[in-house]
């Protein structure tokens, strides 16, 4: 599910970004060159997206919230037992 959402975000960003002037007129001399260029662009965009996620505070906050909630549940179960 996460991979699907990540790919969806990358594809949407590429679509919304639109073609740059150098990409305005595609050269169709070799379809594999176009595919290779798309792969490199996709790799760069996914790399940027992963860096954005890893530098975000959201994963740390989520991990802290789960740890705190789990600790509270353990304490309640320990008190009731």
Swiss-Prot record:
Residues 1-24 form the signal peptide. Belongs to the apolipoprotein C1 family. Apolipoprotein C-I is present in acidic (APOC1A) and basic (APOC1B) forms in P.paniscus, P.abelii and P.troglodytes and perhaps also in baboons and macaques. The two genes for ApoC-I arose through a duplication process that occurred after the divergence of New World monkeys from the human lineage. In human, the acidic form has become a pseudogene sometime between the divergence of bonobos and chimpanzees from the human lineage and the appearance of the Denisovans. Pseudogenization resulted when the codon for the penultimate amino acid in the signal sequence was changed to a stop codon. InterPro entries: ApoC-1_sf, ApoC-I. This is Apolipoprotein C-I, acidic form. It is found in: Secreted. It holds the Pfam family ApoC-I. Keywords: Lipid transport, Secreted, Signal, Transport. GO terms for molecular function: fatty acid binding; phospholipase inhibitor activity. GO terms for biological process: lipid transport; lipoprotein metabolic process; negative regulation of cholesterol transport; negative regulation of lipid catabolic process; negative regulation of very-low-density lipoprotein particle clearance; triglyceride metabolic process; very-low-density lipoprotein particle clearance. One of its GO terms (cellular component) is very-low-density lipoprotein particle.
């Amino acid at each position: 599910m996460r991979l699907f959402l990540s790919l969806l975000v990358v594809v949407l960003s590429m679509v919304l970004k639109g073609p740059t002037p150098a990409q305005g007129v595609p050269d169709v001399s070799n379809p594999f060159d176009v595919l290779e260029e798309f792969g490199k662009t996709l790799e760069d965009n996914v790399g940027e997206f992963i860096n954005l996620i890893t530098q975000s505070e959201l994963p740390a906050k989520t991990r802290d919230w789960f740890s705190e909630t789990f600790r509270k549940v353990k304490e309640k179960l320990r008190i009731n037992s």
